[in-house]
């Protein structure tokens, strides 16, 4: 049973909740929710920080990329061939982007680390460029510890780090605490919550109408200079220029965690903290919408983006999901949830 959130949980408890989590089995086929040439996967890489907190590794996309340039994201990318699994996609792309070895023997022998898969059945999410994004959640830790329990407590101290940037794809690597995403939802009466100091300096959210559907948009702003950052991450050269980051008060550079990356990470943090009841679990991901687009709307097809998709991506306010999805199915989507 997943622990309910009545107090701030330890990193071990957060991980145990993630391991226990089971997404309801999707009634859809793989080709409907993860259609070829529109399918991508990302890896959510968790590890123990300097204060024993659970942190997540994030990247900043290169400005040279055509889509989501300069955005904060997870390591990941698109599938190369039809039968490629989402795990293979995420691990292959993570090796290309940040140097995370796909081979567990290499990770063990050369870097002294192990990687546990925690959640492998997260639902698919829809990106603004009409890709189906499948996340996997993993935990990275040192493999030579005195006790098994230490992997949940001992900070990930890396003397030889695999991390390297692919200048064409990634401009920087950094991390944030997983609990930062939901600390505002935890009970203020709890002493640990009262004393908790989030690393973001600003959080905001608003509703955005995109295609006749309301979307919850969240932003978390983190200063680039962070005393809580892991030393081994600080040794990696930041290839991003100062004009790629936001500037707080005209002085301090910051990174903006928002969009789909923020949505997925928020959901993972909710699961870890036991904040995901059955209703919210049913609202995870965007599989119903992806099916509506692919199966009923003839969108997200392998032969390139449609004129409708291009218009939606470019923000044409005259376009709606109801232009391509049948009325009865749109009614079903809007009855499922009021906010996406």
Swiss-Prot record:
Reaction it catalyzes: CoA + H2O = (R)-4'-phosphopantetheine + adenosine 3',5'-bisphosphate + 2 H(+); CoA-disulfide + H2O = 4'-phosphopantetheinyl-CoA disulfide + adenosine 3',5'-bisphosphate + 2 H(+); 8-oxo-dGTP + H2O = 8-oxo-dGMP + diphosphate + H(+); 2-oxo-dATP + H2O = 2-oxo-dAMP + diphosphate + H(+)
Known cofactor(s): Mn(2+); Mg(2+)
E.C. designation(s): 3.6.1.-, 3.6.1.77, 3.6.1.56
Keywords tagged on the record: Hydrolase, Magnesium, Manganese, Metal-binding, Peroxisome, Transit peptide
Binding site for Mg(2+): 93, 97
GO biological-process terms attached to the record: coenzyme A catabolic process; DNA repair; nucleoside diphosphate metabolic process
Sequence ranges assigned to domain Nudix hydrolase in this UniProt record: 37-199
pH and activity: Optimum pH is 7.0 for CoA hydrolysis. Optimum pH is 8.0-8.5 for 8-oxo-dGTP hydrolysis.
One GO cellular component term noted in the UniProt record for this chain: peroxisome
Entry GO MF terms: 2-hydroxy-dATP hydrolase activity; 8-oxo-7,8-dihydrodeoxyguanosine triphosphate pyrophosphatase activity; 8-oxo-7,8-dihydroguanosine triphosphate pyrophosphatase activity; coenzyme A diphosphatase activity; magnesium ion binding; manganese ion binding
Record: transit peptide: 1-7
Sequence motif Nudix box, location on chain: 77-99
A Pfam family the protein falls into: NUDIX
Cellular compartment(s): Peroxisome
Knockout-associated phenotype: The disruption of this gene causes 14-fold increase in the frequency of spontaneous mutation compared to the wild type.
Keyword ATP-binding assigned: no
Domain of life: Eukaryota
PTM annotation: The size of the cleaved transit peptide can be of 7 or 8 residues.
Membership in a protein family: Belongs to the Nudix hydrolase family. PCD1 subfamily.
Other comment: Present with 238 molecules/cell in log phase SD medium.
Name used for this protein in its record: Peroxisomal coenzyme A diphosphatase 1, peroxisomal
Lineage summary: Eukaryota, Fungi, Dikarya, Ascomycota, Saccharomycotina
Gene coding for it: PCD1
């Amino acid at each position: 049973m997943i622990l309910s959130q009545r107090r701030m949980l330890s990193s071990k408890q957060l991980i145990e909740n993630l391991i226990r989590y089971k997404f309801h089995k999707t009634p859809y086929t793989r080709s409907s929710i993860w259609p070829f040439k529109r399918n991508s996967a990302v890896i959510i890489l968790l590890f123990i920080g300097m204060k024993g907190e659970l942190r997540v590794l994030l990247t900043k996309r290169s400005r040279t990329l055509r889509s989501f340039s300069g955005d904060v994201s997870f390591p990941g990318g698109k599938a190369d061939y039809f039968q490629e699994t989402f795990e293979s996609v995420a691990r292959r792309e993570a090796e290309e982007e940040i140097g995370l070895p796909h081979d567990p023997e290499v990770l063990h022998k050369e870097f002294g680390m192990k990687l546990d898969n925690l959640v492998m059945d997260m639902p698919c999410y829809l990106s603004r460029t009409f890709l189906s994004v499948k996340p996997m959640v993993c935990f990275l830790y040192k493999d030579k510890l005195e006790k098994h329990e230490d992997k949940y407590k001992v900070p990930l101290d890396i003397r030889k780090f695999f991390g390297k940037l692919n200048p064409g794809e990634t401009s920087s690597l950094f991390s944030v605490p997983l609990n930062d995403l939901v600390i505002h939802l935890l009970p203020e009466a709890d002493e640990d919550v009262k004393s908790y100091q989030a690393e973001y300096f600003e959080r905001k959210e608003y509703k955005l109408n995109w295609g006749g559907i309301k979307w919850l948009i969240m932003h978390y702003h983190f200063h680039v200079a962070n005393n809580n950052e892991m030393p081994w991450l600080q040794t990696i050269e930041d290839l991003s220029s100062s004009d790629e980051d936001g500037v707080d008060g005209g002085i301090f550079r910051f990174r903006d965690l928002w969009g789909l990356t923020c949505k997925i990470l928020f959901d993972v943090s909710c699961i870890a903290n036991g904040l995901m009841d059955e209703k919210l679990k049913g609202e995870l991901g965007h599989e119903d919408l992806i099916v509506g687009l692919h199966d009923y709307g003839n969108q997200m097809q392998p032969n390139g983006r449609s004129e409708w998709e291009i218009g939606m991506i470019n923000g044409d306010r005259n376009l709606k999901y109801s232009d391509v999805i049948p009325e009865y199915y749109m009614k079903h989507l809007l009855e499922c949830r009021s906010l996406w």
